[in-house]
Amino acid sequence: MADALPLLLRAYRALATLVAPLAHHTTKTKITDQGIDCKRLRERKGIATQPRPKGELMWFHAASVGESLSSLRLINALAAADPARTFLITSGTATSAHILAKRLPPRCTHQFAPLDSPLYVRRFLNHWQPDEAVFIESELWPNMILETRARGIPLALLNARISDKTAASWSRVPRTARALLSTFRLIHCQDTRTAVHFQALGAAHAAVGPNL
């Protein structure tokens, strides 16, 4: 997989591997200071603290509180339509974990997202083996996306948003932008401006979708 990647992505993958232990140490302080059980710190290394449920599993990745709540609305609708489906939601903040703990519907599990190291992401995917992956808004971690795609797991980006400044930055590395955005089979944007930005970055299939 790495041989076909733009140089910038290959460099990022190598750097992420090197700095992952330091990033985990930094995260440890933030999470434990906000009342999270220290046993859950291993989730940031991709080590699960819950078993994978049987059957089809849909994974939602959300950055923080707002994205997590948006995910829950969609999960509730999908769960009502398909009683056999199970769900996993990942997020990166202690606040989102506390809120989700009070609001998780049946058949839904929360874990902290693995830090964006190839090793940590592979551990995570080895355990959870999701059948589909849904990323919410703007949380696009390259290794998480690339490792998921490498396993043939369909990816969707919903409620996508991107600022003018971020779009301009991505436009300076067009091969990298295309390499990441092309992994998504479905990209639904919050508004026309965002859809135009994504299309200009190489995601011709990006379109305005329902706002979560």
Protein language model regions, located:
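Short hydrophobic helices that act as membrane-entry/anchoring signals
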Residues: 2-31, 178, 182
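Active-site and donor-binding regions of nucleotide-sugar-utilizing enzymes
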Residues: 24-212
